[in-house]
């Protein structure tokens, strides 16, 4: 697998017409130290002891910005509360006023996002229920059985369908676009569901005007992670994102928590749908077996029962439970543990193993109706543990589904949850090691507003720690953030985002495929090493060089005509466009050393005047540590 990945990366370098691998390694080793440690001091001369900066009140409103310049504050907001600036965004925010822009992002329903919705119409799976997805994209074994063929025959038919789909792609004459459409056409069956969901996720990050909403959707999915490749979850994740996460990104935390707890995707992923009172379950199984024997006419006298008579099958439809394959089904602690450790209280939240068991018992009966046919949440009182349960010192004895709902509300409003969620917010939006003063302020707001997500975010954004010099460019972009921000910076037109989603996966963050419930790490140490940096440089060079399938990049429009023949001018222009001219001297020296590379200036047969390879320069700048940070 590693060899195959290396070959893919090298092909990307060759396709981009980039520097030699040795040159790239030299760049990587030069900028790796800058990536590994926060670096907020740039060539603009910002020092830790700098005097307070006074910004126009009309621009900043009540935002407590005293250490960042106007341009820095705008870039900071666009990078932290969104996926970075597109050309023209900085001036647009400046004209609007930063506080007004922030307030607008905190209220996404006030923002017209119809252009994005039009773009998403091409994805046929996004608005389908889990049942319809199962009907339209059934598992291979089920589809083969339905068609009356063997699994091998069905596989052969699918391969032919993929070939037919590729042949039916209407070629546009644009090699990049045609290749991407052909790649997408090959994805048939259930894999199409996750492919379209992934492409739509990237479309939202790149093209949505509701940038903070897109960030929060990603944050909450990562927080309440499910693994799409676990059995039936592949058909349930679309609904999980659309119906559970997205509508609640800035509402009450307890509403989001309960919605995820009732989601078939979460119930299936953490096995709570199988959790049952062992004694009640065995009793129910015995009753089902006895009922089945009666229905089959297995009596001492051998006489089959008559329809509509006592002991015989009813003449109308019934809701008889299906036979369970696992006769030893009992209490499952997975969700009871993770809802405390990962979703609410945190690992040091003050709960015990007995609390985990009690929470699992409170949530027995929270299950899924036919997960591989028509997955819907329902509460099955027959397998619920009845009786008094004590979780975190609180007794639950209402009975039925209410016990679970009350227990989840208790966890959602616990002081440890306020601290844990506030820490997660601050780590994502401010720094890997956020100030305790900020966390305490956010946690206090969390408790006073009963977990109002929008209010907690506003408290964070309107805190001086958010706008501090230490927080500026202190976060390393995860692969998803890097890919989205690069597409935005290049003002790229990406009709088919599949190649971009593939790059996110190649750099270590495949969408919806994080197997452990922890989700992907938000800390730099996970993403910073020489191998990862080479992959990031490779991506930037391939994308900026116009060689990435499914993308259109017009660097001439971005750079302007003046950079055409002077590599130094082109570099300065790239630094200004992509980094607002804010770059450390060590980075500038490293980049300028590459300007002597023969690939930088090239002549064509029809034009002896050497032209700057703008794609290579742009790619190197986009691979710089300042752009890799947000």
Please report, for each region that a protein language model flagged, where it lies by residue.
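Conserved catalytic core of Hanks-type protein kinase domains
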Residues: 105, 259-260, 620-621
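Bacterial N-terminal signal peptides
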Residues: 19-33
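Active-site substrate-binding loop specific to GH73 endo-beta-N-acetylglucosaminidase modules
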Residues: 51-52, 56-59, 177-186, 191, ...
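Surface-exposed interaction patches
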Residues: 215, 240-241, 265-266, 573, ...
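Boundary at the C-terminal end of the N-terminal hydrophobic targeting segment
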Residues: 34-38
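N-terminal secretory signal peptides that target proteins for export/translocation
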Residues: 1-15
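N-terminal accessory alpha/beta regions
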Residues: 85-219, 223, 228-239, 244-248, ...
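Flexible, low-complexity segments enriched for small/polar residues
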Residues: 39-61, 67-68, 75, 79-89, ...
